[in-house]
Swiss-Prot record:
It comes from Francisella tularensis subsp. tularensis (strain SCHU S4 / Schu 4). One of its GO terms (cellular component) is glutaminase complex. L-glutamine binds at G48, E49, S50, R101, I127, R128. GO terms for molecular function: glutaminase activity; pyridoxal 5'-phosphate synthase (glutamine hydrolysing) activity. This is Pyridoxal 5'-phosphate synthase subunit PdxT. Keywords: Glutamine amidotransferase, Hydrolase, Lyase, Pyridoxal phosphate. The active site is at C79, H163, E165. Pathway: Cofactor biosynthesis; pyridoxal 5'-phosphate biosynthesis. It comes from the Bacteria. Catalyzes the hydrolysis of glutamine to glutamate and ammonia as part of the biosynthesis of pyridoxal 5'-phosphate. The resulting ammonia molecule is channeled to the active site of PdxS. In the presence of PdxS, forms a dodecamer of heterodimers. Only shows activity in the heterodimer. Its EC number is 4.3.3.6, 3.5.1.2. InterPro entries: Class_I_gatase-like, PdxT/SNO, PdxT/SNO_CS. It catalyses: aldehydo-D-ribose 5-phosphate + D-glyceraldehyde 3-phosphate + L-glutamine = pyridoxal 5'-phosphate + L-glutamate + phosphate + 3 H2O + H(+); L-glutamine + H2O = L-glutamate + NH4(+).
Amino acid sequence: MTQKVGVLAIQGGYQKHADMFKSLGVEVKLVKFNNDFDSIDRLVIPGGESTTLLNLLNKHQIFDKLYNFCSSKPVFGTCAGSIILSKGEGYLNLLDLEVQRNAYGRQVDSFVADISFNDKNITGVFIRAPKFIVVGNQVDILSKYQNSPVLLRQANILVSSFHPELTQDPTIHEYFLAM
């Protein structure tokens, strides 16, 4: 069965995710409207600016449709996408997870680091990255950086505080496709 991956495309770094999936031979749909959710099997919520993203979700009246989709289908949130999926006022509140926004510093503090995932070293690109500070019992920690979780999964939802789409390594995207 051919799967179609949707990439939320109202703000942020959606094109790099789309390009990564296309390089893997996966059909991609840029999701901008409520009816776009009807033709996809899984969704990526990309990084960007979480407050702006929330405002646009509400302005375009797709917050409820996004919530319903993310409640049952595979979803991957990177950076700001992970914030939107976590606990907090106005967030989707679908993860047993609390985050601290911009915990790794401002834009000028961005960095690249090696992290381990499934016995493989991968590159993590951290740009104004959130820190996962309260991780509930239902959440699996898949990878850490300096003893802090940076890649997590809870049921159908995968989140990273870093940007795997900004590397040439498809490891995390392949993992998401296999969920």
